[in-house]
Amino acid sequence: MVNIELLKSELAGIDIRFDEPLKRYTYTKVGGPADYLAFPRNRYELVRLVKFANREQIPWMVLGNASNIIVRDGGIRGFVIMFDQLHTIMVNGYTIEAEAGAKLIDTTHVALHHSLTGFEFACGIPGSVGGAVFMNAGAYGGEIAHVLVSCKVLTPEGEIKTISAEEMKFGYRSSVIQETGDIVISAKFALSPGNYTAIQQEMKRLTHLRELKQPLEYPSCGSVFKRPLGHFAGQLISEAGLKGHRIGGVEVSTKHAGFMVNIADGNAQNYEDLIAHVIQTVEKESGIKLEREVRIIGETLQ
């Protein structure tokens, strides 16, 4: 049993909200409560939180920007840590260092402001820098692995260390920290000098493509499935006749079948059921088993 008075005393000054519904913070607008939702303002507060949780044997996790995640309806036990206030972006020559809570889109606009090229591919990717590094986010032929130099991480024990891009062992939507449990707290990117107008035009072009193809008008978890070798997930889903298929308030997007949108106050179970149905149907129709890109976390509603 957690001693709440001890928690409040030892973590005084840190913004902690009790039994806080996570659907207020997720891109899907679903998710049950976090026992303790924390918003550290700096690395010092973050380390205090993690060391307290470890000492008191309270589970903890970082939710980041919650853009490619489904939080189950039963919520998450222990501490959920948000990096909303860790969002500093700094430029030094041709490198950008961004804290994990900085929005990836904001980081690309800082690059544009300084006429730095190489980050245009990320101009429409929602979510945070930390989450983007964690999953090696990418679009339009670019990915985080192409520009990352190194990142600072918080280990499960509460220590801070630096990991090089090579040590990250990036793969398609994967990195070594998905296995180690290390949490990105900042990342350094190497870019190249470019022409402001050319960079701006490319970002406008990619943003227009995204607006044309993606269902941005509804809450969603972003791209649901990884791209199967030699195929497109959205095309396989469309060919299986699943465009517009709905379970509860969640629907396979009629605009892009690779997305699932919350059109009518859906819940996390609707998402899980629809994902399972799509995987089963596509495999039956095409022989190809889709693999989830979106992470599903938390507990089912009892």
UniProtKB/Swiss-Prot annotation:
Subcellular location(s) of the protein: Cytoplasm
Cofactor(s) this protein cannot do without: FAD
SUPFAM superfamilies, A to Z: FAD-binding/transporter-associated domain-like (SSF56176), Uridine diphospho-N-Acetylenolpyruvylglucosamine reductase, MurB, C-terminal domain (SSF56194)
Catalytic residues as annotated in Swiss-Prot or TrEMBL: R173, S223 (proton donor), E293
Main enzyme class: oxidoreductase
EC identifiers of the protein: 1.3.1.98
Signal sequence interval, chain numbering: none
Gene Ontology molecular functions: FAD binding; UDP-N-acetylmuramate dehydrogenase activity
Catalysed conversion reaction: UDP-N-acetyl-alpha-D-muramate + NADP(+) = UDP-N-acetyl-3-O-(1-carboxyvinyl)-alpha-D-glucosamine + NADPH + H(+)
Keywords assigned by UniProt, alphabetized: Cell cycle, Cell division, Cell shape, Cell wall biogenesis/degradation, Cytoplasm, FAD, Flavoprotein, NADP, Oxidoreductase, Peptidoglycan synthesis
Any Gene Ontology biological process: regulation of cell shape
Pathway(s) of this molecule: Cell wall biogenesis; peptidoglycan biosynthesis
InterPro entries in alphabetical order: FAD-bd_PCMH, FAD-bd_PCMH-like_sf, FAD-bd_PCMH_sub1, FAD-bd_PCMH_sub2, MurB, MurB_C, MurB_C_sf, Oxid_FAD_bind_N
Annotated GO CC locations: cytosol
NCBIfam families found in the cross-reference section: murB, PRK13905.1
UniProt-listed HAMAP family: MurB (MF_00037)
Family to which this protein belongs: Belongs to the MurB family.
Protein's name according to its UniProt entry: UDP-N-acetylenolpyruvoylglucosamine reductase
